[in-house]
């Protein structure tokens, strides 16, 4: 949060203060398989790539894709739509402190190992210093994440007439 506030202060103090777009992105809740080389559930090939890097990124990506696709809908690769909704509500209320108060372990418990990506949202929110006024959210288990968007300005949503 301090990083976001400092970024916002620097932007507002600059000659471009009112003409800067702050964009923050990251996944919402999602539980991914471990990437910790100390974790016994991590297989030897993955452990070696984590410790020593990947010599052949294309081969690694080709081998990884079927595993990722298999995770879609897998109960261990879940999302938490209730938590995602609560998180977005905090940003609408311009009160991210309850989220920050969760700390590392609390955040991981509620939003999963991939939930730490919401820190980007927190930095952007603190930099702008305004509540979100429009949000949209969809849990997408096939992509192993909750997908959300929010803005600090109103958005007209196109609705087909027929």
Q: Over which residues does each language-model region extend?
A:
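Nuclease catalytic cores that cleave nucleic-acid phosphodiester bonds
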Residues: 11-18
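Flexible, D/E/H-enriched segments
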Residues: 1-6, 13, 35-162
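Conserved catalytic-core segments centered on acid/base and nucleophilic motifs
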Residues: 10-11, 23
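Short, conserved secondary-structure transition motifs
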Residues: 28-34
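Beta-strand elements within well-structured catalytic alpha/beta cores of enzymes
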Residues: 18-28, 124
């Amino acid at each position: 949060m301090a990083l976001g506030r400092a970024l916002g202060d620097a932007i507002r103090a600059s000659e471009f203060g009112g003409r800067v777009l702050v964009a923050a992105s990251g996944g919402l809740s999602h539980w991914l398989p471990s990437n910790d080389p100390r974790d016994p559930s991590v297989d030897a090939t993955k452990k070696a790539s984590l410790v020593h890097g990947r010599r052949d990124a294309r081969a690694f990506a080709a081998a990884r894709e079927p595993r990722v696709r298999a995770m879609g809908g897998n109960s261990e690769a879940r999302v938490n739509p209730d938590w995602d909704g609560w998180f977005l509500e905090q940003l609408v209320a311009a009160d991210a402190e309850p989220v920050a108060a969760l700390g590392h372990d609390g955040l991981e418990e509620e939003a999963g190992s991939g939930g730490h990506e919401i820190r980007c949202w927190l930095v952007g929110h603190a930099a702008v210093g305004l509540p979100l006024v429009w949000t949209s959210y969809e849990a997408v288990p096939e992509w192993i994440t909750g997908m959300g968007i929010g803005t600090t300005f109103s958005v007209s949503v196109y609705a087909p007439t027929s």
